[in-house]
Amino acid sequence: MDDTKRPLYLPFAGPAILEAPLINKGSAFSEEERIFFNLEGLLPYVIETIEEQAARAYAQFSNFSNDLDKHIYLRNIQDTNETLFYRLVRNNITEMMPIIYTPTVGLACERFSKNYRRNRGLFISYSNKDRIDDILNNSTRHKVKVIVVTDGERILGLGDQGIGGMGIPIGKLSLYTSCGGISPAYTLPITLDVGTDNQELLDDPMYMGWRHRRIEGQDYADFVEAFMEAVHRRWPDVLIQFEDFAQRNAMPLLERYKDQYCCFNDDIQGTAAVTVGSLLAASKAANTQLSKQRVVFLGAGSAGCGIAEAIVAQMISEGISEAQARSQVFMVDRLGLLQDNTANLLPFQQKLAQSSATVSQWHIEGDSVSLLNVINNAKPTVLIGVSGSPGQFTEAVIRAMHLHCPRPIVFPLSNPTSRVEATPEDVLNWTNGQALVATGSPFEPVTIGDETFEIAQCNNSFIFPGIGLGVLACRAKRVSDEMLMASSRALAECSPLGTTRTGSLLPKLDDIQKVSKYIAFAVAKVAMAQGLALPLTDELLNKSIEKNFWEPKYRRYKRTSF
């Protein structure tokens, strides 16, 4: 049944309704509602539809000249009338997604304290570590089903932003709703304020976080443990997404909790899933398989290694051995190629290190096995950037790759735009329009000669909303590796280029809600097959997906007793 057709009974009236963003309708309150809820005189005379409100809001939005001001404007609507906010974003998803999330959200995080206006979500400070249960009970959202949590240490490619990192959970949950149909009433952004090592923030009199160096080691681990246990007590079935934790914490936290709670790390697993899905589509478009590709990474942190492990798993599923799959994946960091004799490798890097005996037979120019050396010797067909270092895919690197690969796949994925390893225009110019390009941030189409290329945005928003919707639809208890792999394959099946050999590598953002539902179905099917969710027929699963897919429409309100 469509919930928008049923009335919602409210026990309060007057200005309190206008101050509640989840139920405020603004000028759309009917005459009857204005009388019953003591709103007469508090609103202008005209009663508008949500589309009329959205048209005015879009006109106001268009008057702003820079993206940060547009972001602030949209956040203000979100904080006053969430239904209108999501109608506006749904109507203009391609234009507004870069404003509410990457790349603009990075600037919003940097200026979070200076631009702070109104509370949203929860800030849990280390100094309040003994009162986490009380803080969770203070939330204005009571039926929470999805949490995005960060500690603000590795915000996009911008580093430690302290509590300014709250912009990321807010933005991510906005996409859970805009793209995946998760009701905003069921979402909660959380920042774990464990201090900051950003001296600029510590010295800033406007900084609103806990002025303390970051808590580390066992104190940090105990704090996160207390948080996870408290969340589980408050909302036992909630889905928790870890977001923008530093490399040294991201993988250990994921390994510790992924089999204990329903959780995943979007930087590691979501990025891996969307990248593998994009690579599957690109491989299909080139009439080959992922297992036949040779892949070079620039960036060997938790995100890069997470993608690499997902690629290895997909290659193995296509029939090659694990040893063969790992021999086709090359990880390069700022010191050069990761090898089995490289000092101080992190545990998650060790299995991805190349054999030094093999590398010793290469022709190396210079003192280290640089990215260009790897390109010249490994002769890759795929190049992926997750380094956060702009301009690293130089003309020499791209031309060297194109020299031995007629149709190279190049994914400069670092966010925000200022951190991208190469622009799509440069990559396409250096390969005479032959490269298959996808980026982490949005870019305008590129014209080479008479041909215009749509630039696919290899953005996690194609994956995590569908995962969330699938988890809610089947009430999954965990997020397994197999569920994530299913999301990759489902995304590849939605690729225009992969299915028709024409168009973009990834679907248009206008189709993202359909894609999310398709991914949700695939994810839920695997969860049920693994015994991690309620057993449902395909018909019941589709009904559950539709039931859980919230639409930004106003409901009728009726008065109940105080």
From Swiss-Prot:
Any one Pfam family match given in the protein's UniProt record, by short name: Malic_M
Catalyses which reaction(s): (S)-malate + NAD(+) = pyruvate + CO2 + NADH; oxaloacetate + H(+) = pyruvate + CO2
Binding-site residues for NAD(+), renumbered to this chain: 154, 267, 415
**Which top EC class applies here?**
oxidoreductase
Q: Where does a divalent metal cation bind?
A: 243-244, 267
> Which residues are named in the active-site annotation?
101, 172
Q: Name one GO biological process term.
A: malate metabolic process
Q: Which GO terms describe its cellular component?
A: cytosol
User: Is Metal-binding given among the entry's keywords?
Assistant: yes
Q: Keyword annotations for this protein? A: Metal-binding, NAD, Oxidoreductase
- The regions listed as transmembrane in this protein's record are none
Task: Fetch the PANTHER family from UniProt.
Answer: MALIC ENZYME-RELATED (PTHR23406), NAD-DEPENDENT MALIC ENZYME, MITOCHONDRIAL (PTHR23406:SF34)
Protein name per UniProt: NAD-dependent malic enzyme
The species this protein belongs to is: Shewanella denitrificans (strain OS217 / ATCC BAA-1090 / DSM 15013)
- Please state the gene responsible for encoding this protein: maeA
